[in-house]
Amino acid sequence: IFTTITDPDVVERARRAGIKIHWIHPLFDYNEGKKSFNYITSKMVRVKKREMGLPAIQTGGNVGTTAWFISWLILKCKTVSLIGINHAWEESDGWEKIITHNNDLPIKMEKTDPVFNKLFEKGHNPGFNCDFVLDPMFRLYSMCLKEFIVRSPDWVNTINATEGGSIFGDRITCKNFKQFLADEESNP
């Protein structure tokens, strides 16, 4: 299952590997009629083969949160381990990378600009005792995922095994991936 916002390089690698892709569109906001972002994007993903658009689910608008939803809601996994989904930047990442999401976008903002500190706030993950930088997009993604986790059924257990980032808090257990695997192996 691939979302319409999957990185094109990942899609190309999957196709070269012979993976059959099933597309979905990850919805971001609640449907509020024609002014809704969901309505607008549903119009954008319509193609000749699919006049009604691609299948869509309410997922927080990003690939990681979509995978979390599919894991417990569709696949009925009781424990969902997040790997590589940190919704933040490492403090060691260059600010040019952070400000452009690693794209070649010409954005002119100095790190000393007061706006920079408001838009790119620093945080601390107590579960892994590490610092991170949140940009506006990752802040929103992290906030949505945390809210979805808190609202999920009590039987859903979310583990952050990414070993960093902004995903921690209520109903999220932070543990390194090796420990997660060892715990799962000892509790079949």
PLM segments and residue spans:
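Metal-ion/cofactor- or nucleotide/acyl-coenzyme-handling active-site neighborhoods
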Residues: I1-P188
